[in-house]
């Protein structure tokens, strides 16, 4: 028998599945565009800072020019090292023992902090990429099940009876793939990009540590 309440429940579940998939797609694209812009800015800032750092300008002058809250990930790594460098000086100008180790640890912490900033949100892309196909599969099964229920109720296999349920099933499949495929592709790309950028920060920290080590030994 035809049950209007059952039909309403079916439509409610279908709508929730579709909303989840569409929302996941918009969420993933917002993260993708945000990260692409962030990575482009990070590369530009790193390039500009490298030019200033290797220009021959005294490090203390560069540090003062950057200020207490420098813009740019590499600049913040540099500032963290310089802050510890200045803290390690006694009033008579002599370096406190263990300065090199403290400077290295300070920059290591700064690199980790900048890496977390770059990589935040990427786990959401991974989650969407792995779960959206299964949510879409649930919608597919739900649509096919509704199509069979309609066949049983109408006692007919007419296309007009079967088509709505099949259309819902195909739409759920498509939306699941639409949400998952870009999320997976850009998760892999952005993860690789962030690894390369962070490797640049680590390389700079090592080079800067070497420079400070020479000054400590001189």
Segments predicted by a language model, with ranges:
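Single conserved hydrophobic/aromatic residue that forms the stacking wall/gate
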Residues: 1-9, 13
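Transmembrane alpha-helix/interfacial motif
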Residues: 14-57
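N-terminal membrane-entry
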Residues: 14-18, 117-126, 168, 172
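Residue-level signature of catalytic and energy-coupling elements of molecular machines
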Residues: 15, 29, 62, 78, ...
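Alpha-helical transmembrane segments of multi-pass membrane proteins
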Residues: 30-41, 178-193
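Predominantly long cytosolic amphipathic alpha-helical stalk/bundle segments
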Residues: 43-135, 146-158, 185-218
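Hydrophobic positions within alpha-helical transmembrane segments of bacterial inner-membrane proteins
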Residues: 130, 137-144, 173, 177-185
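Hydrophobic alpha-helical transmembrane segments and adjacent short intramembrane/lumenal linkers
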Residues: 155-169
């Amino acid at each position: 028998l035809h049950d209007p309440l059952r039909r309403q429940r079916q439509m409610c579940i279908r709508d929730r599945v579709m909303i989840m998939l569409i929302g996941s797609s918009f969420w993933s694209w917002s993260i993708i565009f945000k990260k692409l812009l962030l990575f482009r800015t990070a590369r530009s800032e790193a390039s500009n800072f490298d030019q200033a750092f290797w220009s021959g300008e005294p490090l203390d002058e560069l540090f003062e020019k950057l200020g207490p809250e420098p813009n740019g990930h590499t600049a913040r790594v540099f500032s963290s090292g310089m802050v510890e460098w200045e803290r390690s000086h006694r009033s008579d100008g002599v370096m406190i023992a263990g300065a090199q180790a403290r400077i290295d640890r300070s920059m290591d912490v700064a690199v980790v902090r900048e890496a977390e900033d770059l990589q935040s949100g990427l786990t959401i892309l991974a989650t969407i990429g792995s779960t959206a196909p299964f949510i879409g599969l649930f919608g597919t099964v739900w649509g096919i099940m509704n199509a069979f229920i309609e066949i049983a109720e109408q006692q007919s296999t007419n296309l007009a009876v079967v088509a709505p349920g099949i259309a819902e099933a195909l739409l759920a499949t498509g939306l699941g793939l639409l949400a998952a495929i870009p999320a997976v592709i850009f998760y892999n790309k952005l993860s690789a990009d962030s690894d390369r950028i962070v490797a640049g920060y680590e390389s700079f920290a090592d080079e800067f540590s070497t420079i400070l080590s020479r000054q400590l030994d001189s």
